């Protein structure tokens, strides 16, 4: 069903299916993508992971290695009952203030609704990055400051 803005609803089985659509390969603390089109599927906060954090390929806040020139399709799922989150991409790195006040370089997800009634919110966007170092962050006050961010390397 539709939610505010770009957010849609998914059931837990739908969320599990979405998580399988990430096209990266995980090794250590890095998820590496290849090809002309890549699909990054990030979640916050999956069971068993510390709050607040992002998970990609069952890794906590991994570095994402993405080829320059690729089209990046991002799916962000909020599985964290009781809290909203966002997935935004910026050039500014840590440390992040309690009020991050960052300028996203692409229209990200905005703030997610809080999951309820067994439904989880997800949002999707497409990014065409140039080579460089970026960061994915949650803009909910205090979240990036306490570790809810990761690095993206495009080369």
From Swiss-Prot:
Its predominant location is: periplasm
Name which cysteines form disulfide bonds.
none
**InterPro entries reported in the protein's UniProt record:** BlueCu_1 (IPR000923), BlueCu_1_BS (IPR028871), Cu_oxidase_CS (IPR033138), Cupredoxin (IPR008972), Rusticyanin (IPR001243)
Q: What is this protein called?
A: Rusticyanin
Q: Indicate where this protein resides in the cell.
A: Periplasm
The organism's lineage? Bacteria, Pseudomonadati, Pseudomonadota, Acidithiobacillia, Acidithiobacillales
Protein source organism: Acidithiobacillus ferrooxidans (Thiobacillus ferrooxidans)
Q: Which GO terms describe its cellular component?
A: periplasmic space
**Stretches assigned to coiled coil:** none
All copies of domain Plastocyanin-like, residue ranges: 53-155
Q: Which cofactor does it need?
A: Cu cation
